[in-house]
Amino acid sequence: MMQALGQGHIDADTYAQVLRRHHRLLAGFEEQLSDWLVTLVGSGWQYRRRVPALREDLRVLGQPVDAAVPPPASSEAARWGMLYVIEGSQLGGRVIARMLRKRQPGLAHALHYFELADEDPAGWRRFQAVLEQRLQSAAARADAIAGAQAMFAHFHTCLAAEARP
């Protein structure tokens, strides 16, 4: 499904399913770590919430919002690793939005989530610089790697399975 999305070969129902799965994943992350995400400004990074854009896209498509699935929470360094995965996943959003506009123009009104990356094209480089500053010890880097691996597994779980009521 994700490969078809990246190539723009996806119908509206499947696209809505992708958005619902992303919502499950990101709503869980943003709800569980909401307080921590607000403190990131003091570290030099401002997290841009994705859930409002996802909810808007789902609303436009007339789709329900699936329940949030929180990721495993851990140390602050592990949270930075989790955030690394989320911020990195945004990079492909531009490509996906561009491809869908070209191949599925009927979905152009529901691309708010994937177009978030366009708001700050240099953001990834800035995030990497902040990450370097926050993870200076070998132990912090090891925890961040564990957090990133946990978030990759969480992505896989949320994107691969249908939501259960």
Swiss-Prot record:
GO terms for molecular function: heme oxygenase (decyclizing) activity; metal ion binding. InterPro entries: Haem_Oase-like, Haem_Oase-like_multi-hlx. It is an enzyme of class 1 (oxidoreductase). Keywords: Heme, Iron, Metal-binding, Oxidoreductase. Signal peptide: none annotated. GO terms for biological process: heme oxidation. It catalyses: heme b + 3 reduced [NADPH--hemoprotein reductase] + 3 O2 = biliverdin IXalpha + CO + Fe(2+) + 3 oxidized [NADPH--hemoprotein reductase] + 3 H2O + H(+). It comes from the Bacteria. Induction: Expressed in dark and light. Part of the bphO-bphP operon. Its EC number is 1.14.14.18. The keyword Heme applies. It holds the Pfam family Heme_oxygenase. Belongs to the heme oxygenase family. Catalyzes the opening of the heme ring to form the open-chain tetrapyrrole biliverdin IX with the release of iron and carbon monoxide (CO). This is Heme oxygenase. It comes from Xanthomonas campestris pv. campestris (strain 8004). The gene is bphO.
